[in-house]
Amino acid sequence: MDATRRDLPPGSVVRRRTDRIADVLRAETTGGALLLAGAVIALIWANSPGAAGYDAMRSFTVGPAWLHLDLSLAAWAKDGLLAVFFFVAGLELKREFVTGELRQPRRAAVPIAAAVGGVLAPAAVYVLITAAAEADALRGWAIPAATDIAFALAVLAVIGRHLPPAVRVFLLTLAVVDDLIAIMIIAVFYTANLSVTPLLATALPLVAFAILLRRRVTSVWLLLPLALTTWALVHASGVHATVAGVLLALVVPARPHSQHEHTAAPSLLERFEHAIKPVSAGLAVPVFALMSAGVAIGGLGGLVSALTDPVAIGVIAGLVIGKPLGVIAVTWLVTRLTRTGLGNNLTWTHITGLSMLAGIGFTVSLLIGELSFAAGTERHDHVKIAIVTGSLIAAVLAAVILRLPNRAGSRGNDATTRDPDQTRVGTATQRTTPDHPTPAATDANQPARSPAP
């Protein structure tokens, strides 16, 4: 997939600069900053004297009409660029299931269950709040159920540099599974008119794509047309086109071609993820935020009107209350009712902070919001304001909570390390330990000894 880059001499200035830029874009803080910048620019532009230019840009139509792909730029961002984002998310998901933490169900049980709780609880909170509103308000039940991987990991990268590595693994597993559920929700509940013929025809380019990869054919001139054809057929079927990104990702081999290959040799999946992640973080997600986050607030009165809409209240409550409630409650139940491993340097303070990070919906929530309510309507604008507000509140609360173990850890008197049997919870990893484990943590991970005979 990086054939053009391989054509450059290894020591060339262009290649060095390209590699440097790509490395910067792979950093989680960079992706989150670009995402936030796109959203801020959209909000400022939509509320400036040049707001008409923003609307004109979003509605500008481009694409081949004979393929029914004459779409607005906003639609291209939603259906096209987000497919790249979901392709990367699908690669991460498959990597975790095949070679990562999810390959062992016992280790993955807690974050997977937490993800399910983090979908059900905010949806339930939203439904409870909007049940008395108009009937169409319930169409947005899935908006607060999503987690923005890029934004959440970026916030964690900034505030959690002194946290155990297991914290990031737990969040990544939770967010990836959360996005998988969101993709299934989009495919099942937000497909209005299903065309069976193009949907069945999707199998042809998808299978060809998979066969080429199995044979280690990585020519961009062969793979890209097949990927674009798969995307176009999914789009024509009525299923949201982002699903194509996940389908393509799931057929990418996650293991080295031969068992005799050196264990350090990257798989095709790792190579694809390495090559395409900068495109997702540096282009796809920020441009989608630019195209989708802009909403005319209308001053203080407009803001009050938006935030008093039952739908907006339901979205904010779902993200800020429902998400943490679902994640924490299900995590507690699973760790108490099953024999999941304890220890791994995670405390309930960590879980509480991570549950707030999961409340950063943003990208996927904006997508579901556009699928739930017609663009340009007052309710759709209220949903946008609610998503931005709820995500920011969740991010701030997460930052405050996750700074607590940092301060406590620096003093060496974090109460959660004193009684590991009561405060530690299972996570998706058993591989990471703190650089300087406390005696309590060390004892908690030692097998029980039988009395000497």
UniProtKB/Swiss-Prot annotation:
It catalyses: Na(+)(in) + 2 H(+)(out) = Na(+)(out) + 2 H(+)(in). It holds the Pfam family Na_H_antiport_1. GO terms for cellular component: plasma membrane. Belongs to the NhaA Na(+)/H(+) (TC 2.A.33) antiporter family. The chain crosses the membrane at residues 32-52, 71-91, 109-129, 140-160, 169-189, 193-213, 232-252, 284-304, 310-330, 356-376, 382-402. It is found in: Cell membrane. It comes from Salinispora tropica (strain ATCC BAA-916 / DSM 44818 / JCM 13857 / NBRC 105044 / CNB-440). Residues 409-453 are annotated as: Disordered. It is a multi-pass membrane protein. Na(+)/H(+) antiporter that extrudes sodium in exchange for external protons. GO terms for biological process: regulation of pH. This is Na(+)/H(+) antiporter NhaA 2. PANTHER family: NA(+)_H(+) ANTIPORTER NHAA, SODIUM ION/PROTON ANTIPORTER NHAA-RELATED. Keywords: Antiport, Cell membrane, Ion transport, Membrane, Sodium, Sodium transport, Transmembrane, Transmembrane helix, Transport. GO terms for molecular function: sodium:proton antiporter activity.
